[in-house]
Amino acid sequence: MNPWRLLRACLQRFSAVFKGSQSQQSFADEIESHLQLHIEDNLRLGMTPEQARREAILKLGGVEMTKQSYRERNTLPLLDDLLQDLRFALRQLRRSPAFTITAALMLSLGIGASVAIFAFVDAALLKPLPYRDPTRLAGVNEAVKLFGRAPLSYPDYLDWKRLNNVFSSMDVFTGTGFMLNTSSGAEPVEAARVSDGFFRTLGTTPVLGRDFYQGEDLPSAQSTMILNYATWKLRFAGRMDIVGQVVQLSGEPYTIVGVLPEDFHFALDGGAEFWVPFHAKGECDLRRSCHSLHGIGRLKDGVTIQAAQSEMQSIASQLERQYPGDNRGQGATIELLSELIVGDIRPILLTFLAAAGLLLAIACVNVASLLLVGSESRSREIAVRGALGASRVRIVRQFLTEGLMLVTLGCVLGLGLAGLGMRLLVSLIPKHFFEGMPFFLDLGLGWHAIVFTGVIAGMAGVLFAVTPLLRLPLTALRFGLAEGYRGSTGTVWRRFGSSLVVLELMIAVVLLVGAGLLGKSLYQLLHVNLSFNPDHLAILTVEAPPSLYPKDENLIALQRQIISRISALPGVESVGLTSVAPVSFNGNTDWIRFVGRPFNGEHNEVNLRDVSADYIKMLQAKLLRGRLFSDSVDGAKPKVVVINQKLAEMYYSGQNPIGQRFGNGSLDPNSIKEIIGVVDDINEGSLGSPIWPAVYYPIYQDEDNSFTLMVRTSQSEASILPALVSTIHSIDRGVGTRGESTMSTYIHDSPAAYIHRSCAWLVGGFAALALVLSMAGLYGVIAYSVSQRTREIGVRMALGAQRSSVYQLILREAARLTLVGIVLGLIGAVGAATLMRTLLFGTAAWDVGTLASVAVVLGGCALLASYIPARRAASVNPVEALRAE
């Protein structure tokens, strides 16, 4: 056939499908006109009207056969049948609005929750990092006794970079802070110090200006900086002539040389606005024992992460032998950069996705139960269609179309709920959390989420198509018109419906137990013993620019003036300063070596905290032995320290630590300190983290330009925060403040508390919805069972059965289903809780109290859900029941 004629025929058939009855009616009218012409010719030949019509029809070859032949030649039968199925499915949904609305709402809840959580999983775990060839990027850190992932020292970085053969490039970064002079005064800003090739290793090129030159991170190089895109827009109005401008940071001039792309985010930079070269000028930068840097490297082609780990560990061992005093016990930790960024939140997101998936499963099972109930009323319809010649394939296709239509409606509503849910969840994430999770900033329903929704829709559509057919086997096509058919399948349906209810209850138990364990874990975390009183405490960080306070004596004078002025404020009871706030992180560590003991290369790592004399008293922590610091203790006096109980137990077990001395790994004379006191184990690390050995130094003996001010007040701690800030600015407007908060809020908003609270609330919400849906499913099955057993109940009551026995009959069935669901659910819940044990704090996966509580709650709800059908069954009139049958 000519290809153009073939194309024309195909287009004609395709268009005829959508023209529908209009095209067929036009052809029928034309056939009828031809038929009338032939009839008139036959009448003129003297035939009777009947003979004339008969001969005309014979001449045309049969009118109906001609119409059918036209339809077959000018339409696509399969597509035409599909459109018929769609129209019929729409009529079915409109005919049962209550069923349609109920099923669509159930599906939308499950689909919306699953898609919303999947969007978070997609953004964090599935999408590649926004860098060139991100699978070749690795995080490079050290490994020590207390840390599996520890910062590098600058000398170690130089050696690692020089000696390795696995990275084509290797660079470092570290967070820092500056004071930026603004119209309102000095403002603390976040920044990052990076080596010269940092952005080249990532594969990022500035959109304006240039990258750092090679060697621009050397101490002798000029002070330059690259701006974050948002900083360029907000602080500098997006000026195109910004390159070359000079900005004062902490009193030092920095020349702007470039602007980063708008889509550049680095999750580990602490929200840096300014990027400056790493100039190793400070005393800490040059010490091998001072660890403050994090590394990134680009793997050479063909090098695996395992090979990189092996070589860097070998280099670390070589440096340990070369520098035994500083590098004792130091290893290497090499991992993919993606794992470094999202590894900690992976189990959380997967837990959320599993919970949402279980909720979706309950919703689908509930809708399947509704379809089973609805299939009872359609048994006669299916039997009639089978009697008229409809094949089983056509009937299956019809049910599949109806299922897909229902799922499509649920998907449309679910995508709307997913969009709302994502915006709600993102709005609940504290702003400072986005610094470590920038991939959530532009969260949306991408093509991954659309494909995920399509997969859900396809699977659910098939489930909803198959479910009614389980109720209507082939025998329904033959016997569906018979009166006895319903009774022959009622028992089978009840068994299948009961299995669905058990499945619902089992899933609900798993979610409820998970929510209960996470809720208990949150309670345990928020009530953990901090060893200090967090009530009525205000906290803020003070930034004193090094250009204004270059020497220790300048800083000491400022700190003493701050303490004096703050102490004079109304309602202030005590004031303390510390280098690191409690309940923040375990870090800022050093290695110690004990005077008078043999040294065998032990790696004794401890937390270091510089605190003022009244700091321990201000916290209301217990002094267990010895004494605290006094104001007379300063840099000119012998160095003294206070230790925590953990350090005393680890290194002075059975001894009195008071008067004992220790120093750094080399026992330099200037590093020797004497222990004057032992205090309780203050929670220095993140909420709920293990207690580490800690050493408290007098803050005047080890100065830092950034320190934390803590104030205990007799009034509302929130109300005193403005007075604290204004008092500090009245001393010197060049001194900045940030992080103003109450200690209670500080703890409440801490990462550990937020993560546990999010897990508990989100999984708890899913569990509550699962409980409601499972109870609705149980109610539906019991109610339908009662309707199917009306005649049986009527016969029982006619033979003398009491209402109480009918109650027992129905409630016994509900209790059996509930018991099986609870037992299976508890078994599954313990297994699921074991998988998420990393999210639990102070709570066992098999916590008996939680398991028992869930069993009681679910059992009570099941009793209530079954009571109404049971009461209806007990109210059956035997005469009316038998007459109805």
Predicted region positions:
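Negatively charged linear elements and acidic catalytic determinants
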Residues: 1-105, 298, 317, 321, ...
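Mid-to-C-terminal secondary-structure elements
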Residues: 9, 177, 190-214, 222-350, ...
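Alpha-helical transmembrane segments of integral membrane proteins
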Residues: 70-101, 337-342, 371-397, 401, ...
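Short, strongly hydrophobic transmembrane alpha-helices
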Residues: 97-124, 128, 362-365, 407-412, ...
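Small-residue-rich transmembrane alpha-helices
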Residues: 117-120, 368, 404-477, 517-520, ...
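Short juxtamembrane loops and helix-capping segments at transmembrane helix boundaries
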Residues: 121-137, 143, 270-283, 331-336, ...
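Membrane-proximal extracellular/periplasmic loop immediately following the first transmembrane helix
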Residues: 129-177, 290-296, 523-525, 529-591
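Interfacial "coupling" helices/loops that link adjacent transmembrane helices in transporter permeases
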Residues: 363-407, 776-818, 822, 872, ...
